[in-house]
Amino acid sequence: MTIQFDADFVWGAATSGPQAEGTFHKKHENIFDYHYHTRPQDFYHNVGPDVASNFYNDYENDLALLKQAGVQALRISIQWTRLIDDLESGTVDPVGADYYRRVFKTMHQLGITPYVNLHHFDLPVTLQHLSLIHISEPTRRRGI
């Protein structure tokens, strides 16, 4: 049996920062990091996001392998906890911005189209805790 795809069909892959990059050079924890650091037993063989698949350090080789496999697009996430320096002011971390710039430049050079998302297991844990406080207080006042 032969399956024919349209000429404009895009072969792609997907990953997320927390599942691929590891926690290298990040100033903040996201909810995935926090879960691992507080309950490592919840993770298979206690393996968590600290190293992940090491995409942070191996992205050039990993992207070259994707190109070699015929991948034309990659859905990838930008971790807020890597990109944002100060969560209250929203200032950008230059190290994080440079990392993503290098990743996207490499993808462009290889002819791999990036599809970027901004949320995939990566809500900063600080914001999670703030939202729980803001949600919980009115709930307590209402006796719910």
Predicted regions: what they are:
Residues 15, 77, 139:
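Ser/Thr-centric signal marking residues that sit
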Residues 133-144:
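Single conserved hydrophobic/aromatic residue that forms the stacking wall/gate
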Residues 89-91, 129-132:
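Short low-complexity, flexible loop/linker segments enriched in glycine and/or proline
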Residues 120-130:
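Catalytic cores of eukaryotic secretory-pathway lumenal/extracellular enzymes that build
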Residues 19-21, 82-85, 123:
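Flexible loop/turn segments at secondary-structure boundaries
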Residues 1-69:
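N-terminal carbohydrate-binding accessory modules
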Residues 63-69, 74-119:
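Aromatic-lined substrate-binding rim segments of carbohydrate-active enzymes
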Residues 24, 86-87, 126-127:
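Short, conserved acidic/polar surface loops in the N-terminal third of protein domains
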